Amino acid sequence: MSIEQLAETAQAMVASGKGIIAIDESAGTIAKRFSSVGIENIEENRRAYRELLLTTPKLSDYISGAILFDETIRQSTKAGVPFPKYMADHGIIPGIKVDKGAYPLAGCPGELVTEGLDGLRARLEEYYKLGARFAKWRAVINIGDDIPSGMCIDANVHALARYAALCQEQGLVPMVEPEVIMDGNHDISAAYEVTEATLRSLFNALYEQNVVLEGTILKASMVIPGTDCEEQASIDEVAESTVMCLKSTVPAILPGIVFLSGGQTDAQSTAHLNAMNQLDPLPWPLSFSYGRAMQQAALKLWSQDMKGNFAKAQQVVYERAKENGLAALGKWKG
């Protein structure tokens, strides 16, 4: 695929007032989500739930793409239409999570490195044939006493850049996600410092490995205090700190940035995004790539009556998409 085609896909992913829904939960994660609302974790229930999300009427009004898990990209609607085809036919770009998860980084207690580079070229080639047009790889950066180390950041951004280069070789837009974890008692200045260091290293690694930024999307953490920090930040503080951090680290040529919700409540994730988009002018579109913050309310409703509440749960998904779509324009009223 040409650079022009990659750039076109990347720009479509961050189209004005649209974001990306993350439904790429691993088997273990979806098991926890289902268990929390009393749904049996079997393949048909997982398929039905993903169908609920992906076939929500008019979803493409506010959703440009969806990140799928390996199981989901191979599944179909009840009517037998493969999910990637259904999505493409309804204006939603299919994406695929390709990393194999984060594991302890040898020699660095309390730190993690994401695995999954082995065999990635062949997997990306297959995913492209299955209909995927972008991919996602998540790195995990913890904040604690004397962490993250430079070694941890370097190991993770090197893997992100290798993944990104392989994606572009195979015609997929790489979404690079260095998640700075909210867990901990660190304050907002510590979150800023770690996020800034991580993003500086990431874009240096992308440059060194010849990744074309015009065909790349950043999935970023907001700069936010740890969940156990006594001094929580206001909506405006989070918005201003996040935008300042991004402006100091992210090249303006990047097509756009989408945020992860990272354990924020539905209302927080939407309010923070909205406040950021009121801080004009911005060099790039700021939108969303939420998982829990898009799904949780709908999942709870669906669990109460999986047949009877199917359409009602889809309406909840649509409303959450609309709220976040408005926030991506700075027009959410709360």
UniProtKB/Swiss-Prot annotation:
This is Probable fructose-bisphosphate aldolase class 1. It catalyses: beta-D-fructose 1,6-bisphosphate = D-glyceraldehyde 3-phosphate + dihydroxyacetone phosphate. The keyword Lyase applies. Pathway: Carbohydrate degradation; glycolysis; D-glyceraldehyde 3-phosphate and glycerone phosphate from D-glucose: step 4/4. One of its GO terms (molecular function) is fructose-bisphosphate aldolase activity. Pfam families: Glycolytic (PF00274). Belongs to the class I fructose-bisphosphate aldolase family. InterPro entries: Aldolase_I_AS, Aldolase_TIM, FBA_I. It comes from the Bacteria. Its EC number is 4.1.2.13. GO terms for biological process: glycolytic process. PROSITE patterns: ALDOLASE_CLASS_I. Keywords: Glycolysis, Lyase. SUPFAM superfamilies: Aldolase (SSF51569).
